[in-house]
Amino acid sequence: MPKSSNLKMQRKGSLRENGLVKGLNKNKFSISKLKELSHADDSRKSHRIIRSGKSSGEAYKQAGKGLMNLGNHLSDWGAKSSNLSLNDISDKIGVLVSELGETEIEFVKAFNENRIKFKAIRAMEDSIAPSRAHRQRLISSIEREEERDPLSPKLTDLQNQLVRTEAENLVGEMQLDNTSREVFKSSFQGLMDAFQLRAQKQMTLSYYASQLAELINDEVAYPGDNPAAYSQKYATQIMHQCVESMARLLAPVTSETTEHVGSDCEFTRKSSSSVEFSDHSQDSGDPSQQNILQVKNVQAVLSIPEAESYKAQLLSSIAEEQKKKELQAKSTVFL
């Protein structure tokens, strides 16, 4: 078992220290820096979020293309092998590796859709920037006029302008606040859902690819040995099960599945392909049918309210177990 220290997050609960984020390079000059300068000061931080998200999406896309090429080369390499197991398994694993690359490409689409939502916040910040600047100029003008001549008639006009500007600014600030909360929530909920779906797909595909690799006999062979003959039947069964698991993963949630899972666990949904695998024999009398994989559904990724409910139930069960242990300890002492 790994040490508990290895299971900790590499970052603290906040990236800020004294209100600043360490290691954030803002002074590096580039073409994208020129684009950033075209936006108001108030919207440059949101512009950096959009820009850095774009580079991250491109990196995921390149990784997906690389995996698809890897799968193609793997299948091409195995086609020339005289070993039947290598020939067949390399082709099938190549298919699954290519599918892993395809999941990256699909993830990038969802990633960009949610990243672009931040443009609404940037546009709102750009639109409210002139009002903020005008308000600040009026405040500075009033301060200068008061220092020069406290009885100046211009003060009344400037103060009236400031009242009107602050009223307009108040409406704009409220619109910005509403837009920021709505877009931030929608964007990152969609983004985290995309991460969860990508992880489930990769978990499913990588598991079956690992099971295919297990079918290869890696024992050392010597001249004159007669290794066991390879049968494509088990590899074909694994591929069929993989297809079925991926289909279940992408199947929409229905009221029937929700009610069925709700009877077992109130906070889970049966919309995921999160799978657990167990060895099962189709025919107990035939030893050749041993270790055939069988898939069964387990709980899916929880939504935020469901996760909170699960957390509350989990804490409650832990508290009850702790009370039982304390009562048992007390009864032991009395005895």
Curated annotation (Swiss-Prot):
Annotated keywords: Cytoplasm, Cytoskeleton, Meiosis, Membrane, Nucleus, Sporulation
Main localization, broad class: cytoplasm
InterPro entries: AH/BAR_dom_sf, PIL1/LSP1
Gene Ontology BP term (one): endocytosis
GO cellular component terms attached to this protein's record: cytoplasm; meiotic spindle pole body; nuclear membrane; prospore membrane leading edge; prospore membrane spindle pole body attachment site
Keyword Transferase: no
Protein name: Meiotic expression up-regulated protein 14
Gene: meu14
